[in-house]
A protein has these predicted regions:
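Class I S-adenosyl-L-methionine-dependent methyltransferase catalytic core
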Residues: 1-203
Length: 203
């Protein structure tokens, strides 16, 4: 797991789908105050197209690049795209936001954003990118053991994005067990689960 870098996949077709859903739910739920967004697998939180990880496989070419080059007349998709243009100051797209960046752009300063990342290098980048924001709290712990603590310390409506690397086979069981615990312990909680189907027959 600690060899994983989300930059390899940033902006690919799966990221586009995941972040479109995230932006839709952020806009829908943020009207319920107080509001907290929690990302226990935050990565670096934002990604440069010039970064060596994004350039290795260039997965963004079949993801966000295709979307940006397609004429789309849908208000919900435009909400997602507008945030990408916003972080790029409406200039040439050179930055693709991670979930943390999308949340920061979509939410208000009175909303709270909890970010967690175990990978030391990614955590360093996450802090560098977001620690100047007073409504963002950043931790460097095991995501599964820390998630319930982050939720318990939050007030009001909560949105959680559970998006592990799945490089460790046990991640599948850990996600399901985590959902069971969250469902039993917490109210006013919505969870987005990234759960790749790698083997159709098995899953």
């Amino acid at each position: 797991m600690l060899s994983y870098r989300h930059g390899f996949h940033a902006g690919n077709f799966a990221d586009v789908f995941k972040h479109f859903i995230l932006v839709y739910l952020l806009n829908h739920l943020k009207t319920k105050k107080p509001f907290t967004f929690i990302d226990p697998f935050a990565g670096a939180g934002t990604y440069s197209f010039d970064d060596k990880f994004m350039q290795k496989n260039k997965e963004y070419l079949t993801g966000i690049s295709k979307v940006l080059n397609t004429k789309i007349n849908d208000p919900y998709i435009n909400d997602y795209l507008n945030l990408i243009h916003l972080v790029n100051n409406n200039k040439k797209i050179s930055i693709y936001p991670g979930a943390a960046q999308f949340a920061l752009l979509a939410l208000e300063k009175k909303d709270t954003i909890y970010l967690n990342e175990l990978h030391s290098s990614e955590y360093f980048n996450l802090k560098k990118n977001f620690e100047s924001n007073s409504n963002v709290k950043i931790e460097n712990k095991d995501a599964y053991s820390n998630l319930t603590k982050m939720i318990a310390s939050s007030k009001g409506q909560k949105l959680v994005l559970i998006d592990p690397s799945y490089e460790i086979k046990d991640d599948f069981n850990k996600v399901l067990n985590t959902l069971t615990i969250l469902n039993a312990k917490f109210e006013n909680l919505t969870a987005i689960i990234w759960y790749p189907v790698l083997n159709v027959e098995k899953n």
